[in-house]
Amino acid sequence: MEPAGPCGFCPTGEAQPARYTCPRCNVPYCSLRCYRAHGSCAEEFYRDQVLGELRGRSASPSRLATALRRLRQQRETEDEPGDAGLRPGPAPGGLSGLWERLAPAEKVAFERLLSRGEAGRLLPPWRPWWWGRGAGPRLLEELGDAPSGDAEELEPSPARMPPEPVRDEPAAVEQVLGDLPGACPPAVPTRIPALASLSRGRTSPLVRFQLPNVLFAYAHTLALYHGGDEALLSDFCATLLGVSGALGAQQVFASAEEALQAAAHVLEAGEHPPGPLGTRGAMREAARILLGEGPANQKSYTLAALGDLAQTLGRARKQAVAPEERDRLYRARKKCQFLLSWTNENEDALTPLALDCATAHRAHTVAAEDVAALTGELEQLWGGPLPPARRTLIEELPG
């Protein structure tokens, strides 16, 4: 049944009969042109419905919510309102109506993606802002002396970031890889206080080892949340502080390897989803950030990342209600500001830290390859993924 009355968005005296209804406020409209004039209202409706549904799920809901931003791009290329996911008559039933229209196999496939934390495969790959143009050759030059091919492991490759497709998933949910442009780099803070103004005594030499831990968590969280979403700011910061012991628990590390292992252990223990990077990928991205734009301005990326973190934590603190959460976010923000001042005055320490990250990345890669090779040999010996049942060699017969 079509909505009664004229379109609510046509110019006065030119109103056409209404054929569609806004799903949020039920205002009638006649065409795609009028819908676009009222598009923000419809976007908010679908956004609220999707976020409300996904907040109850534990498998990376934020990266699915990011797909809402792509709806605007899709609508700009559509010719008919029906193609934009709208239908004549009353407002649609939201996610529940869409879910009911899925086939049983499609429902099972989608639930499997959520349970495995792989729903991000439905989205295009996200390109980090620190993947600047020509980064590959410069990284190879900077880490050319790194042992065991660490330099080659750090060469950017957009296709590496998304997880590998699962073989038993339908083709409809396989991700289409693309070379998307990266987000604009966050601005480096214009005013960075002197380190002496933040600390009365001598700065500990162990401060430097907190950077790999913080940047590991930063790269992991950005990739997991597909660049971040203001509506999920609280979730973003909870993941960030959960992965980074330096920010979330004021942890101190004796080496870069220990700092990276602490963050990697959080992911390997299943406390947070591994995301598209995994532990090795986050180590690799931490090294890239530490290397910066080049020898002439190496600290630029690290300063931009720490400044971005300080601003993000500040916004989250304003939204937080619980005193404990506000205090935790405040301390994490202060830590980022301290590291910002330290980095600004200790640029020479960044290259050794980047090499430590590259070495740790290579060690994890070799260990993973060894485990995969051993697993393959055992499965070949067993004839499957599980060992065969034990056979009874001697059995006592009843007397």
UniProtKB/Swiss-Prot annotation:
It comes from the Eukaryota. Zn(2+) 2 binds at C22, C25, H38, C41. Residues 71-97, 141-166 are annotated as: Disordered. One of its GO terms (molecular function) is zinc ion binding. It holds the Pfam family zf-HIT. Keywords: Acetylation, Metal-binding, Zinc, Zinc-finger. PROSITE patterns: ZF_HIT. Zn(2+) 1 binds at C7, C10, C30, C34. The keyword Zinc-finger applies. A zinc finger (HIT-type) spans 7-41. InterPro entries: Znf_HIT, ZNHIT2. The modification N-acetylmethionine is found at M1. May act as a bridging factor mediating the interaction between the R2TP/Prefoldin-like (R2TP/PFDL) complex and U5 small nuclear ribonucleoprotein (U5 snRNP). Required for the interaction of R2TP complex subunit RPAP3 and prefoldin-like subunit URI1 with U5 snRNP proteins EFTUD2 and PRPF8. May play a role in regulating the composition of the U5 snRNP complex. Interacts (via HIT-type zinc finger) with RUVBL2 in the presence of ATP or ADP; shows a stronger interaction in the presence of ADP. This is Zinc finger HIT domain-containing protein 2. It comes from Bos taurus (Bovine). The lineage of its organism: Eukaryota, Metazoa, Chordata, Craniata, Vertebrata.
